[in-house]
């Protein structure tokens, strides 16, 4: 065994090393704790039977278990020592690499399996020890595996591909074994093998999981159990703890459950992919050196398999015996299994940290094992392990899925499609199998779609891509193709999927969670797969046509023969997972030294996408590819390796996914230019699609297909789906397939053409810093893609950026010789990678989507939504929705420009998009990609694909135009389809996914825009960059937030403009691309615009001018926008370039409406007039562009919002029509305010429509239809979560835009100005709850609805324009910019408002608002605005009663603090502020903004900083009062209206008192309602106190300590007022405290406790613990990534094991972060924390409320901190349920909200102390898992305050865990004299008994003792 291990050790080491490196990264990513040791541990565990021994604790320990075993260490050392060595040796020499695989199998199986008691391993062990006779060994092993097919098939693989098995291509490994299992497994998979596997195969899987971990045999065994990587992944998921607990632990530990999600993605995805990549590389080298060796078994097939899927057992796959069978079922099954599994535990887990964590024990281990297997693949070359890490969780499934999908898909899909037709070589070709898998997936999605995709995608793409891409990419990829050909083929097929997961990993927590979670279901996975297929098909159309067009496949199928592609994908993801961040950074740094390697790796990773195309090409060119692959692979083996490392790092951060595509972009610069182009094309497509796929996986398979459909549809539309990612490549792809059939020429052409985005942007903008980030993005189409995907997944955005950076670097190098860009971009990539890694890590805990990706977000769309919400909070935690979080975070660090813009944009996107998922959702991850949007997108894309496939096939330009048309159609169709599909998505209630999708789609749309005209292409990249990088913070904010998908698509030009202007300040550089870009968009959009906006324009120039200055003031984007607007407008409307710019800004809304109208028309016109449709799309784009240009921040945001709103779904048509901003807004606001948004949307949409109609002809046109739609959709929207539709269109979109602007530019610059109005509804969750609460408790709203229902119906549609305008302004604050601008034009008074409105958006908005409100709007507009706002809010109760409600809402608007006049402004400000907060809160703020959108006043209220969140619920209460504008003003004062009216921004205290008094009078019933009072309290902090005092304090559960002894404490838990006379707080005793905490948490922990006020508060005080207190504070870093966050007690990330989310952040009383200012600004600058929390406090305790947020009564601090952080958001919705305030508002805050449930530690929210990801309060941030806190002695949660945490942390530092031997144990055995201490997770793993009566623990030794 030792000799075998040594033998294998070399390989095993390589694998292990790779795992060490990769898995270290993975583990690090997965579980944030140091992962080097961990990966080592993993390797050790793998290398040794350490795994079996239960190295899990070690793994859990983090890097802790390095010394787990001497042998393990030795193996580790061997691996590590051989890290470079094995990588080089094993990689180069790798003579035993086949053996390595076998050895790996054997080492893992042998030593590990032996320990794992894998009997099967015994047999495999000997074979693995025969690395030399690998063929024989493999055969034996295979036989053994086959014999043990049920469980050891992985062994088969291990034997066959012992090397392959180790590859962590569980997929692939599983695939050869699947031959036996294929039939059974297919059923299993059909049955969601995950479950079957979980129950029947868990142990085998678990048992083999170690094998899997140790070698792919484990995977194979797992596969045999699971019958494929998917099964492996499923096994992971299915085999929860029981399966392979030892493994489980290591895997889990390795996977780091919280990061595990992402890690799962990374792990799952990368394990297969990364390992595969590494294996590919290793195999490449090994092939080089050991081709003969590998040939032993199947000289070439083994080579191919080992190269392509060495760890995929493709060596044996060469036999094809397994593949056909396994492939037929396995790919699907694998995917399905993976899907279910994904969806079940890993993905869901990824989607939401806990999911994976909770189900993941085995899953995790499996994932870990899988990555372990995988790691060897990417062994020494680069720490792919870490990179793999990224993909472990979500991607583990995808990875194996990809692998299996590749292999099995090839067998399965190929079987149906190619297998029969393809030669055995082809069959053995992993790429082919990948294609087959994809085909299978596609078939699963729908044979029709598949046929369409195949036929349509193959034909056009086949032409250009086939010849050029196929060969060139294949040759280049062949360098990296060997592995790809072998294992990566499957993985590539899966790679696209994997890459999507990779993308998802980026947004893994948002999106991957979506992806995996979504993948969890067959549909999602199939969709994902289809997505991959389509991604391939889209670029090469061949993906679907995989067998039809091998070359096309090569080009399109990144997973195809081009190992590079495969590898790129695999590397991308595996690198991502396996490469540690630092490692990757180093790699990046090193890569800078050897950009070639980076390029190679990047190209490879890009090729991963390209391989999608190549995969198909592989069908035809499989032999060629195979022939080429070995040598090529050898050639690029090392570079890919390094690159994979590089990529891995990126991917691991969820940047890797993008970077991979991006990297290949860089690579294409050199050898892989073609590949880069191709890969980028596909990779971006993949990534973009991943956003969609993962965003949409849950929504439906259709989503994936649709995504793909769009892509395939558009050769350019293909890019449409991946607009951003495909930005260049879609064009390039389209160009490649239609334009230029030269892959090489194409990449360069792309670099030049797509690089018009690249080169143009790189050339022009390349120099710009933004260029660095953005041009890099633009440069790297993949990056753009990533932007798209990232837009889809916030997380992905950074990857996109990174990729863009890398590719940008190389491309720029190529294009502009921008070595600076190379260095800068590389640096950016490094930073981005590191950041992305961070992001990924952060997202690990999360996307989406985090997750996401969110990606982002990643349950189904629902999950996405959940994820989005979760992501919203998570993203808040992460600093973006899901995704948006990691992405934003990484972006922020990534590059100053990118960081600022992209981060902000991402924050916006994440929060708006993800927040809306998610956010992923993006991506989302998104995380994470918008699920709803995705689904709708997918369907729309699909539809557009079907419709536009032909147009897309036209030609480069034709394709582009059709692409634009398609994009437009896809966008529009998506929007129209969204109405069709989105209804389902909406039904799925995935506003966030929608947002993600929107973002993605926006990006797509923008891409088609760009694609529409080659000139545009440059813009598009910029746009993509913008969305991705948010080139200009303004643009990023508005566009990123508003138009990641939509903004990107429709805002692309404007994004570009912005980007160009922002990046290369003048549009002059931008003009080439921008002018041309805007020209077509403007031409297209201009025509429509002229039609829609000509009138508007005329009226709007001055408003626009105001807006423009405002916008510029607000953000550079405005300036950029202006020039861009000029360009766009010029093209659009030759009449007034400058004017038009401004006009555009104002018109943005009109444009949005135009877009809406355009959409409306477009659905009818459809692709009828491609030009026209394109124009419309362009119009959409242009509108966004104009939006972007004119009201860059606002409009773009609006456009984005509108775009999002359409994406949202049911209201998609309405959404489509109302405004892109609306759509976008919907996404933005999707999380919570969807309903509110629906109401607001309705009222605003109506207002917006009316205003629109009023504003201009086009506007009128649109509004006419729109209002009807709105009206129609109003109630649907109302019912559905498309609140953002109308509301964003009206108010939110602009606010969102402004918010974006504010958030980006204003956040820093405007925050001072906006401080007064910055209302940070921090958490999407809170908003959601708020929306729900408000809906539930909105008597006044209902009253108002009843009061003014008569006029309501007519008003929305055609109320008096003035009223409508006002309503629009008030209700449609966001459209106000455009619509209000129109209205302003229409209404003299509004014109100033319009001007002020833009200003409002700007930091100066407030003053402008005040002025305008006071001057014109205050009187009539004010009333009307209030009315409008009332209407939106009233709309909530009655969607139809817009006018009456508006009127009744007048008061409400006032009550909401949305002054009638200022309402519009306020909406800007409020929404902007809210948006800013929302951006921060990512999804939560989206909810808040939704609230804001729901009532412009609400944001105002929020601005006021009290709890203006419940405008819908509570504003309703005050609405009676609200009707009285004066009184309302009082109420509004705290809201914002009063502030504006009276000029008091923060004088809400006195005002609230009045308002409160009024409210009391008017809402006498409400006071009786605890929730209602809470709301009131929230509204008025000062008055709240009075109120609280006046009223009997609300009862809070408490624990009375009867008696305290040394050992026992008698406590009485008082849960009801009658239970105990005196309310005691928690006792000191831990049990008591826990109990108390539980109790009080269970009750209205937040609300009741705080309301225990008066006596209660005072009484408990004596019993309050004397220990240090921590307050729940705001999440200081919006980029907080779950991956970065670890529990301060157990040091594990969120969702680690079953720990659930992390609660927090808790800050020491003395250092509550001052970042609240944003929150405070959002809430109220004056006492934001205090005031915001005061309302909450008030809700909780009036008196305590008085206490400062920090110094507030102990119970109150949580409230203040929480409210401070999410004051407005929580205050309003949470006001009702304060407990929600912390939990839901906060990401996973257990404390206030969760605390209600935390007591049940059923939720076991894990909060963890955030690793200070961001400077500032982060160092003081403490995140804790609920269970850890509850079970840790001396830690109590009292009234939201966490007592004793610091002490417990100090004590824990010295406590060694008896289980994992790591420091930090916090729970000790309660048995007298027992010294065993554990981490909570370790204790649960160790079998300790938790006694909930007293929260004590008994170790296994004493658990049976009395």
Curated annotation (Swiss-Prot):
What InterPro entries is this protein classified in? EPHD, Trans_Reg/Chrom_Remod, Znf_PHD, Znf_RING/FYVE/PHD
One of the record's GO cellular component terms? nucleus
* Cross-link named Glycyl lysine isopeptide (Lys-Gly) (interchain with G-Cter in SUMO1), sites: 819, 901
Family matches, as CDD domains: ePHD_RAI1
Q: Map the zinc fingers (C2HC pre-PHD-type) to residue ranges.
A: 1780-1835
GO molecular function: any one?
A: zinc ion binding
Gene3D superfamilies named in the record: Zinc/RING finger domain, C3HC4 (zinc finger)
Pfam families of this UniProt entry? Answer: zf-HC5HC2H (PF13771)
Spell out which residues are annotated as carrying Phosphoserine.
339, 345, 568, 683, 805, 880, 892, 1064, 1122, 1352, 1358, 1374, 1431
What residue spans carry the Polar residues bias annotation? 13-24, 252-261, 541-563, 937-947, 1482-1491, 1517-1534
Q: What is this protein called?
A: Retinoic acid-induced protein 1
What broad taxonomic lineage does this protein's source fall under?
Eukaryota, Metazoa, Chordata, Craniata, Vertebrata
Gene symbol of the encoding locus: RAI1
């Amino acid at each position: 065994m030792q000799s075998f291990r040594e033998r294998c050790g070399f390989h095993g080491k390589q694998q292990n090393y790779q795992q060490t490196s990769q898995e270290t990264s993975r583990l690090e990513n997965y579980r944030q704790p140091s992962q080097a040791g961990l990966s080592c541990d993993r390797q050790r565990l793998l290398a040794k039977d350490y795994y079996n021994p239960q190295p899990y604790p070690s793994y859990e320990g983090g890097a802790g278990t390095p010394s787990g075993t001497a042998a393990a260490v030795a193996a580790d050392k061997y691996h590590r020592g051989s890290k470079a060595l094995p990588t080089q040796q094993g990689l180069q020499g790798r003579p035993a690499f086949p053996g390595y695989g076998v050895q790996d199998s054997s080492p893992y199986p042998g030593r590990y399996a032996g320990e794992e008691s894998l009997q099967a391993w015994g047999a495999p062990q000997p074979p693995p020890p025969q690395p030399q006779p690998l063929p024989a060994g493999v055969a034996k092993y295979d036989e053994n595996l086959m014999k043990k097919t049920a469980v050891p098939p992985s062994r088969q693989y291990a034997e066959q591909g012992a090397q392959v098995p180790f590859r962590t291509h569980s997929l692939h490994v599983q695939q050869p074994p699947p031959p036996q299992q294929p039939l059974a497994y297919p059923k299993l998979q059909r049955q969601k093998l995950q479950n079957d596997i979980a129950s029947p195969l868990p142990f085998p899987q678990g048992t083999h999981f170690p094998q899997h971990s140790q070698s792919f045999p484990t995977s194979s065994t797992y596969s045999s159990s699971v019958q494929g990587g998917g099964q492996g992944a499923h096994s992971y998921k299915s085999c929860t703890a029981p399966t392979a607990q030892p493994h489980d632990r290591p895997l889990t530990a390795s996977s780091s459950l919280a990061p595990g999600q992402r890690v799962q993605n990374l792990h799952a995805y990368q394990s297969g992919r990364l390992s595969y990549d590494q294996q590919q590389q290793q195999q490449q080298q090994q092939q080089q050196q050991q081709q003969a060796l590998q040939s032993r078994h199947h000289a070439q097939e083994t080579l191919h398999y080992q190269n392509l899927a060495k760890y995929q057992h493709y060596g044996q796959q060469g036999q094809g015996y397994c593949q056909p069978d396994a492939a037929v079922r396995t790919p699907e099954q694998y995917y399905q299994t993976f899907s279910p599994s994904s969806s079940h535990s890993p993905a869901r887990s990824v989607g939401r940290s806990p999911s994976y964590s909770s189900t993941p024990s085995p899953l995790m281990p499996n994932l870990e094992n899988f990555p372990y297997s995988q790691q060897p693949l990417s062994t020494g070359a680069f720490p792919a392990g870490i990179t793999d890490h990224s993909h472990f969780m979500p991607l583990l499934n995808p990875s194996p899925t990809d692998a299996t999908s590749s292999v099995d898909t090839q067998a399965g899909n190929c079987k149906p499609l190619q297998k029969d037709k393809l030669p055995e070589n082809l069959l053995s070709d992993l790429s082919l199998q990948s294609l087959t898998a994809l085909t299978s997936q596609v078939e699963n999605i729908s044979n029709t779609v598949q046929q369409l995709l195949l036929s349509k995608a193959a034909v056009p793409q086949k032409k250009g891509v086939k010849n050029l891409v196929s060969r060139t990419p294949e040759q280049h990829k062949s360098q990296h193709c060997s592995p790809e050909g072998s294992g990566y083929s499957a993985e590539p097929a899966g790679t696209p999927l994997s890459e999507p997961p990779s993308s998802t990993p980026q947004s893994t927590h948002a999106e991957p969670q979506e992806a995996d979670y979504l993948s969890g279901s067959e549909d999602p996975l199939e969709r994902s797969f289809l997505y991959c297929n389509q991604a391939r098909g889209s670029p090469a159309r061949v993906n679907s046509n995989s067998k039809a067009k091998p070359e096309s496949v090569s080009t399109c199928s990144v997973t195809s023969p081009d190992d590079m592609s495969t590898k790129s994908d695999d590397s991308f993801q595996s690198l991502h997972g396996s490469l540690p961040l630092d490692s990757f950074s180093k790699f990046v740094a090193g890569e800078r030294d050897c950009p070639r390697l980076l390029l190679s790796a990047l190209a490879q990773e890009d090729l991963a996408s390209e391989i999608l195309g190549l995969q198909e090409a592989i069908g035809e060119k499989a032999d060629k590819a195979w022939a080429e692959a070995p040598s090529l692979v050898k050639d690029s083996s090392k570079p890919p390796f390094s690159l994979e490392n590089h990529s891995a790092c990126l991917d691991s951060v969820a940047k890797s996914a993008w970077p991979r595509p991006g990297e290949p972009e860089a690579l294409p610069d050199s050898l892989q230019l073609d590949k880069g182009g191709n890969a980028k094309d596909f990779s971006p497509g993949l990534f973009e699609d991943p956003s969609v796929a993962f965003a949409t996986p849950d929504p439906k398979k259709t989503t994936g297909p649709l995504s793909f459909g769009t892509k395939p549809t558009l050769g350019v539309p293909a890019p449409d789906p991946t607009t951003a990612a495909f930005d260049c490549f879609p064009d390039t792809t389209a160009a490649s397939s239609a334009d230029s059939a030269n892959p090489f020429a194409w990449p360069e052409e792309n670099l030049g053409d797509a690089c018009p985005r690249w080169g143009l942007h790189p050339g022009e903008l390349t120099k710009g810093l933004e260029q660095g980030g953005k041009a890099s993005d633009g440069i790297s189409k993949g990056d753009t893609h990533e932007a798209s995907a990232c837009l889809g997944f916030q997380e992905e955005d950074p990857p996109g950026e990174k990729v863009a950076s890398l590719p940008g670097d190389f491309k720029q190098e190529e294009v502009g010789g921008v070595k600076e860009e190379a260095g800068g971009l590389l640096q950016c990539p490094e930073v981005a990678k590191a950041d992305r890694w961070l992001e990924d890590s952060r997202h690990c805990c999360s996307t989406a989507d985090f997750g996401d990706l969110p990606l982002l977000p990643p349950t189904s769309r629902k999950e996405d939504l959940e994820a989005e919400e979760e992501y919203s909070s998570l993203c808040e935690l992460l600093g973006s929705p899901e995704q948006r979080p990691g992405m934003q975070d990484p972006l922020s660090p990534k590059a100053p420009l990118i960081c600022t813009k992209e981060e902000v944009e991402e924050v916006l996107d994440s929060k708006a998009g993800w927040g809306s998922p998610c956010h992923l959702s993006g991506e989302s991850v998104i995380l994470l990609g918008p699920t709803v949007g995705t689904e709708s997108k997918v369907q729309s894309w699909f539809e557009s694909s079907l419709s536009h496939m032909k147009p897309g096939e036209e030609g480069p330009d034709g394709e582009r135009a059709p692409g634009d048309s398609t994009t437009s159609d896809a966008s529009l169709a998506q929007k129209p389809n969204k109405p069709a599909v989105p209804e389902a998505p909406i039904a799925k209630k995935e506003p966030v996914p929608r947002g993600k999708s929107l973002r993605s789609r926006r990006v797509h749309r923008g891409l088609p825009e760009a694609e529409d005209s080659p000139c545009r292409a440059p813009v598009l990249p910029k746009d993509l960059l913008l969305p991705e990088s948010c080139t200009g913070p303004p643009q990023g904010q508005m566009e990123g937030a508003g138009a990641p998908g939509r903004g990107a698509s429709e805002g692309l030009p404007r994004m570009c403009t912005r980007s160009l202007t922002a990046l290369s300040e003048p549009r002059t550089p931008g003009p080439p691309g921008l002018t041309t870009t805007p020209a077509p968009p403007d031409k297209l959009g201009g025509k429509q615009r002229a039609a829609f906006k000509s009138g508007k324009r005329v009226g709007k120039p001055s408003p626009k001018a105001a807006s423009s200055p405002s916008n510029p003031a607000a953000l550079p984007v405005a300036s950029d926008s202006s020039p861009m607007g000029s360009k766009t407008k010029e093209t659009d409307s030759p009449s007034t370039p400058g004017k038009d710019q401004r006009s555009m800004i104002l018109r943005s809304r009109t444009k949005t409406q135009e877009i809406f109208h355009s959409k409306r028309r477009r659905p009818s016109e459809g692709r009828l007039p491609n030009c026209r449709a394109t124009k419309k799309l362009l119009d959409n784009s242009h509108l966004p562009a104009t939006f972007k240009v004119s009201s860059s921040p606002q409009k773009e945001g609006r456009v984005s919002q509108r775009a999002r709103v359409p994406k949202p779904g049911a209201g998609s048509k309405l959404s489509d029509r109302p405004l892109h901003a609306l759509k976008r807004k919907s996404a933005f606001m999707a999380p919570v305010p969807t309903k509110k948004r629906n109401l607001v949307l309705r009222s605003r949409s109506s207002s917006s429509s009316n205003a629109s109609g009023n504003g201009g002809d086009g506007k009128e046109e649109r509004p006419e239809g729109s209002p009807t739609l709105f009206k129609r959709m109003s109630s649907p929207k109302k019912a559905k979560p498309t609140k953002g539709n109308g509301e964003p269109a009206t108010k939110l979109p602009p606010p969102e835009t402004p918010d974006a602007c504010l958030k980006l530019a204003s956040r820093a610059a405007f925050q001072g100005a906006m401080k007064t109005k910055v209302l940070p509804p921090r958490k999407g969750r809170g908003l959601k709850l708020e929306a729900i609460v408000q809906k539930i408790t909105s008597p006044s709203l209902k009253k108002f609805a009843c009061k003014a229902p008569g006029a309501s119906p007519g008003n929305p549609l055609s109320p008096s324009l003035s009223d409508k305008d006002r309503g629009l302004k008030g209700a449609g604050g966001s459209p106000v910019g455009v619509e209000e601008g129109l209205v302003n034009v229409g209404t003299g008074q509004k014109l100033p408002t319009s001007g002020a409105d833009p200003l409002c958006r700007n930091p100066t908005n407030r003053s402008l608002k005040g002025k305008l409100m006071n001057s014109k709007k205050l009187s009539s507009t004010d009333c009307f605005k209030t009315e409008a706002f009332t209407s939106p809010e009233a709309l909530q109760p009655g969607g139809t009663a817009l006018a009456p409600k508006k009127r009744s809402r007048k008061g409400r608007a006032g009550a909401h603090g949305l002054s009638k006049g200022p309402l519009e402004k306020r909406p800007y400000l409020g929404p902007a502020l809210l948006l800013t907060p929302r951006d921060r809160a990512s999804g939560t703020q989206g909810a808040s903004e939704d609230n804001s959108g729901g009532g412009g006043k609400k944001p105002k209220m929020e601005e006021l900083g009290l709890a203006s969140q419940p405008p819908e619920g509570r504003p309703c209460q005050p609405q009676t009062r609200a009707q009285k504008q004066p009184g309302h003003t009082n109420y509004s004062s705290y809201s914002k209206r009063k502030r504006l009216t009276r000029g008091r921004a923060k004088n809400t205290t006195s005002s609230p008192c009045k308002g409160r008094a009024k409210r009391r009078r008017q809402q006498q019933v409400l006071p009786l309602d605890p929730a209602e009072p809470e709301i009131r309290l929230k509204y008025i902090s000062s008055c709240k106190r009075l109120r609280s005092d006046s009223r009997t304090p609300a009862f809070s559960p408490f624990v009375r300590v009867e008696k305290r002894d040394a050992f026992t404490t008698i406590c009485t838990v008082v849960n009801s007022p009658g239970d105990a006379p005196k309310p005691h707080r928690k006792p000191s005793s831990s049990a008591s405290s826990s109990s108390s905490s539980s109790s009080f948490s269970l009750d209205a922990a937040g609300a009741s406790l705080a309301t225990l006020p008066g006596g209660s508060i005072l009484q408990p005080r004596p019993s309050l613990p004397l220990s240090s207190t921590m307050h729940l504070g705001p999440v200081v870093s919006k980029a907080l990534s779950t991956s970065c966050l670890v529990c301060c007690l157990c040091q594990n990330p969120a969702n680690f094991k079953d720990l659930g989310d992390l609660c927090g952040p808790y800050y020491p009383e003395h250092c509550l972060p001052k970042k609240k200012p944003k929150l405070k600004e959002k809430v109220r600058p004056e006492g934001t924390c205090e005031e915001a929390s005061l309302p909450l406090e008030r809700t909780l305790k009036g008196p305590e409320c008085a206490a400062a947020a920090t110094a507030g009564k102990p119970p109150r601090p949580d409230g203040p901190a929480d409210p401070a952080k999410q004051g407005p958001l929580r205050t309003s919705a949470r006001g009702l349920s304060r407990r929600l305030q912390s939990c839901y508002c906060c990401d996973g805050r257990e404390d206030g909200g969760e605390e209600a449930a935390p007591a049940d530690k059923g939720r076991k929210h894990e909060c963890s102390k955030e690793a200070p990801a961001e400077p500032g309060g982060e160092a003081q941030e403490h995140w804790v898992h609920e269970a850890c806190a509850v079970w840790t002695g001396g830690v109590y949660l009292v009234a939201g305050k966490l007592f004793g945490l610091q002490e417990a942390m100090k004590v824990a530092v010295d406590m060694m865990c008896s289980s994992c031997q790591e420091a930090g144990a916090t729970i000790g055995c309660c048995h007298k004299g027992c010294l065993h201490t554990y981490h909570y997770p370790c204790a649960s793993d160790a079998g300790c008994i938790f006694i909930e009566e007293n929260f004590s623990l008994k170790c296994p030794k004493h658990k049976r003792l009395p």
